[in-house]
Amino acid sequence: LWTPEHSISNEELVAAYNAYAEKYNAEHAGEIESGELTEKPLSSAEFVAKASGIHSRFAYCKDGILDIDRMRPRIPERSDNELSHQAEMALNAARIALKEANKDPGEIDAVIVSCAYTQRSYPAIAIEVQNELGIEGFGFDMLVACSAATFALQRAYEMISAGTAKCVLAINPELTSPQ
C-alpha cells in the first residue's frame, strides 16, 4: 500500500466548501431570491464524517482542492512520452509490494492495473510499470469502476489457479478522492 504524502481533513475540506458556498450564494443572491437557483447549503466536518465515515483523505495532488475558485486538484499535464501520474503512483505501490513480498521484478509473470479510469488510453499503465521495473511478463489495464481493485485480485487469483501465472502484481492507482 502506497499512501500519498498529502492529506485533507474534514475540517479543511468543509472550510473550503463553506467559503465556496458563501461566495456562490452572495454572487447569485438575486437568482436564489427569485427561485431560479438553489442556495448552496453549508456543511460541517461532523456531517461529512457521519455521512461518509471519512475523517481525512489522502490526495496525490492537494493543490487546487481547497481553492474555492477551483475545488478540484491541479494535476499538471504530462506528455505521452513521460511517465503518467497514475503510473508514478503504481510504481510507488509496486516497489513497496515487491519489497514486502520479497520478490524481484523478474519473478513477476503479469501486471494488472485496475482502476475506475485512466488519464490516457495509451500507453497502458501496466506497460509503463513493466518498462520501469524491467518486468518481462505480460500486463494489461482494467477499467472496472468502483470495484476495480477486487476485479484485479479476482483475475490474479484466476491466473494463478489456472497455472497461466505464478506471480501477479495487481495495482489500483486511483487519482480521485471521495468527498
Predicted regions and their residues:
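Short acidic/histidine-centered micro-motifs embedded in hydrophobic/aromatic stretches
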Residues: 51, 114, 171
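Short glycine-rich or small-residue beta-strand-to-loop segments that form or flank ligand, phosphate
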Residues: 109-116
